[in-house]
Amino acid sequence: MTYHPKSDFLRVMQERGYLADCTDMQALDEALSKGVVPAYIGYDATAASLHVGHLLNIMMLRWLQKTGHKPITLMGGGTTKVGDPSFRSEERPLLTPDRIDENIEGMRKVFARYLSYGEGATDALMLNNAEWLDQLNYLDFLRDIGRHFSVNRMLSFESVKSRLDREQSLSFLEFNYMILQAYDFLELFRRTGCRLQMGGSDQWGNIVNGIDLTRRVLEGEIFGLTSPLLTTSDGRKMGKSAGGAVWLNGEMLAPYDFWQFWRNTTDADVGRFLKLYTELPVEECDRLGALQGSEINAAKILLANEVTTLLHGRDAAEAAEATARAVFEEGGVGGALEVVELPAATLGEGLSVAHFLVAAGLVASGKEAKRLVAENGLRFNNEPVGDANTPVTAATVGEELKVSIGRKKHKLVRLS
């Protein structure tokens, strides 16, 4: 029988499709109904930006704050030095402390778009687990914390078991990650009264570890809640596109390309994505998702505008839509297209089309460029390019050259 939550937060989670599992739904619902509940999601600083795959959990934190509770974004300045082994086929490369700090700063910019930070009861709080993990005494930690963990149980977690079943090495360093993440929950409960950890369903084992540890050490009543691991209707993992990761930082992915990612949503995903990634009413999301034929394209544009507005602002969303209209409907250039600067010296007396595309970073290899041309997938200033060996000179580029790769990828190349 489906449980019907009383609290606004759990009701939103259930209605909009954010909820996969919860350790104790009724007890958490009671706690959320009685007062402010601090809740956190942890983010290891493995890249300079978060990507679209992180956005679902960020929206959960946003809804948590909108429904009167306190979101905590926990930066993994300490755990990133170890690396989360969950469902990975190999050990992560270790990052330097300076790189970790740079990555955290890049992530901070994204969170500031979705959450309101401050000193109030429901203002968001950003913490770094390096504050306590860097201070740990190893022997004390083994005695006080390590004794609460069963290696037998840890080996049974699917995230670890799948790695071992493939006979791939799991280092002692990575194995410790689970204990450190569990300790984070204990420390957050001690410092802030945090009572809820959220994350993707692949984090279930780590979350349960933290709950068990905190109950054993501090006898705290705390909870875990996970979201489904999201894939598109055609089976692709969220966060990736044909061109690579869909980054949330504007410096790493232009707002136009971010907008275009959402505009290209498969028809079957429109209603679901509207519920997960926008704040439109559920009934409106369902209505838009049920549209057919050409009408669904208007819903996709609305989806792209709403998601881009949350991240980059309304002006950026409107500029992206105007550019898309100019590019696709009017054959123009559009002011929001990403500009690629190519040193004039690189072009020299001229390069073949294939070498030009590689030099500008628009394709990964000459082989890919030749395949693109052979499949009639390349245009310069809206004109088809029929020969990968055609020379590209400074005169070809002029003030700027619009390069279209397929129907959906468009860049402006300028010489510098």
Curated annotation (Swiss-Prot):
A motif ('HIGH' region) lies at residues 45-54. SUPFAM superfamilies: Alpha-L RNA-binding motif (SSF55174), Nucleotidylyl transferase (SSF52374). It comes from the Bacteria. It is found in: Cytoplasm. Pfam families: tRNA-synt_1b (PF00579). Homodimer. Catalyzes the attachment of tyrosine to tRNA(Tyr) in a two-step reaction: tyrosine is first activated by ATP to form Tyr-AMP and then transferred to the acceptor end of tRNA(Tyr). Belongs to the class-I aminoacyl-tRNA synthetase family. TyrS type 1 subfamily. This is Tyrosine--tRNA ligase. It comes from Cereibacter sphaeroides (strain ATCC 17023 / DSM 158 / JCM 6121 / CCUG 31486 / LMG 2827 / NBRC 12203 / NCIMB 8253 / ATH 2.4.1.) (Rhodobacter sphaeroides). The lineage of its organism: Bacteria, Pseudomonadati, Pseudomonadota, Alphaproteobacteria, Rhodobacterales.
